[in-house]
From Swiss-Prot:
Gene: psbC
Designated name of the protein: Photosystem II CP43 reaction center protein
Sequence positions bearing Phosphothreonine: 3
Residues cleaved off as propeptide: 1-2
Membrane topology reported for the UniProt record: Multi-pass membrane protein
BP term (GO), one: photosynthetic electron transport in photosystem II
Organism name: Tetradesmus obliquus
Function as written in the Swiss-Prot or TrEMBL entry: One of the components of the core complex of photosystem II (PSII). It binds chlorophyll and helps catalyze the primary light-induced photochemical processes of PSII. PSII is a light-driven water:plastoquinone oxidoreductase, using light energy to abstract electrons from H(2)O, generating O(2) and a proton gradient subsequently used for ATP formation.
Keyword field: Acetylation, Chlorophyll, Chloroplast, Chromophore, Manganese, Membrane, Metal-binding, Phosphoprotein, Photosynthesis, Photosystem II, Plastid, Thylakoid, Transmembrane, Transmembrane helix
Localisation per UniProt entry: Plastid, Chloroplast thylakoid membrane
Family that this chain belongs to: Belongs to the PsbB/PsbC family. PsbC subfamily.
């Protein structure tokens, strides 16, 4: 009986016998068909851009200006808002038209890419080497492969520079640290000091150091993109105009599956970094759009109760909690004045609504008694009830309100999805790296299944 999974099924003129791969192996059937593989890639790009455009318009259609973005489950509009589109002081949305334009532009682009994908999949030449040698390639051609790497690096560099140009010359970007609670700001003095920019890379990823995730000002972010954009473009030119050195020729496996494994490893790393960035960072991911970080929600709660009880007559400087430590304020391990209670674990949190109340030795008692502004109280109360925690009542000392039961923070969505996808991509990296290395070493592909128990079992029919 013929089934979808046996070798006799032919799809698109290609069967398992002629290609070595079944229909469900997807693009593996196109390994040596550069024209058809181009079609698959362009169509894939079209799907990605279509999702971006359609989801963008979906979020615009459902957007309620009176509610914060993070309360509406949005993940695309916060990115556009962070780029300075449609927002004003305090992150307030003042114009949704730029978001609509973004969605339409992506939809139009996806149509062009979709047409190109269909054309190259069905009509265009199966291979490019004969008709279009510049675009053709052989997987083992080391020089051609590094040329292609170079083109990719240049495009990535241009992408990084687009953010720089937007921030410096085309309207600026949203800066959560702008005085008074955040605003769109032109970055006139980006950090170009290599010691500062690359100092982030040399930091420990643990504890309060936080590697590149610890970046806490827009000047460093834009300056970092200047460096990354320039290095990517220069690296791209290098790889285009040079051939791989002997040590590189020997060190790497030069096959299609090897390149796939390298790409999966790189994307996996990016996924893990994006996970940490979206979860911990409130500069690149402003809390006005993505909601508070976990530590931020916890500190907000401590601040809110301090404000409330201070108004009711409590002496917040000396009141003791049930453990004998300070109920509202206490000392950090290094002597700074910090919030007391369970939020002590987040004592090194930094946020634009709290920093004005600090002095040279942590929180300033005089400022806490006399200088708290209404916008700080409002923001802390809002953040306190929108913690990015998967709990109906209490986690880590953060109490949520009944109205927050159905709230899931965009930080939770973004961090979880990027971690899970990053992990799967890492497994894919290991899988394809192992296959590529085995093939390069001349091993038998696949696993010997002669001893599988299923082979000795009675057929189902």
């Amino acid at each position: 009986m013929e089934t979808l999974f046996n070798g006799t099924l032919t799809v698109g003129g290609r069967d398992q016998e002629s290609t070595g791969f079944a229909w469900w192996a997807g693009n593996a059937r196109l390994i040596n068909l550069s024209g058809k593989l181009l079609g698959a890639h362009v169509a894939h790009a079209g799907l990605i851009v279509y999702w971006a455009g359609a989801m963008n318009l979906f979020e615009v259609a459902h957007f309620v200006p009176e509610k914060p973005m993070y309360e509406q489950g949005l993940i695309l509009l916060p990115h556009l808002a962070t780029l300075g589109y449609g927002v004003g002081p305090g992150g307030e949305v003042i114009d949704t038209f730029p978001y609509f334009v973004s969605g339409v532009l992506h939809l139009i682009s996806s149509a062009v890419l979709g047409f190109g994908g269909v054309y190259h999949s069905l009509i265009g030449p199966e291979t490019l080497e004969e008709s279009f040698p510049f675009f053709g390639y052989v997987w083992k051609d080391k020089n051609k492969m590094t040329n292609i790497l170079g083109y990719h690096l240049i495009m990535l560099g241009i992408g990084a520079w687009l953010l720089v140009w937007k921030a410096m010359y085309f309207g600026g970007v949203y800066d959560t640290w702008a005085p008074g609670g955040g605003d769109v700001r032109i970055i006139t003095n980006p950090t170009t000091n290599a010691a500062v920019v690359f100092g982030y890379l040399l930091k420990s990823p643990f504890g309060g150091d936080g590697w590149i995730v610890s970046v806490d000002n827009m000047e460093d972010i834009i300056g970092g993109h200047i460096w990354i954009g320039t290095l990517c473009i220069l690296g791209g030119l290098w790889h285009i105009y040079t051939t791989p050195w002997p040590w590189a020729r020997r060190a790497f496996v030069w096959s299609g599956e090897a390149y796939l494994s390298y790409s999966l490893g790189a994307i996996s790393l990016m996924g893990f970094i994006a996970c940490c960035m979206s979860w911990f960072n409130n500069t690149a991911y402003p809390s006005e759009f993505y909601g508070p970080t976990g530590p931020e929600a916890s500190q907000s709660q401590a601040f809110t109760f301090l404000v409330r009880d201070q108004r009711l007559g409590a002496n917040v400087a000396s009141a003791q909690g049930p453990t004998g430590l300070g109920k509202y304020l206490m000392r950090s391990p290094t002597g700074e004045i910090i919030f007391g209670g369970e939020t002590m674990r987040f004592w090194d949190f930094r946020g634009p609504w709290l920093e004005p109340l600090r002095g040279p030795n942590g929180l300033d008692l005089n400022k806490l008694k006399n200088d708290i502004q209404p916008w700080q109280e409002r923001r802390a109360a809002e953040y306190m009830t929108h913690a990015p925690l998967g709990s109906l009542n209490s986690v880590g000392g953060v109490a949520t309100e009944i109205n927050a039961v159905n709230f899931v923070s965009p930080r939770s969505w973004l961090a979880t999805s990027h971690f899970v996808l990053g992990f799967f991509f890492f497994v894919g990296h290991l899988w394809h790296a192992g296959r590529a290395r085995a093939a390069a070493a001349g091993f038998e592909k696949g696993i010997d299944r002669l001893d599988e128990p299923v082979l000795s079992m009675r057929p189902l029919d």
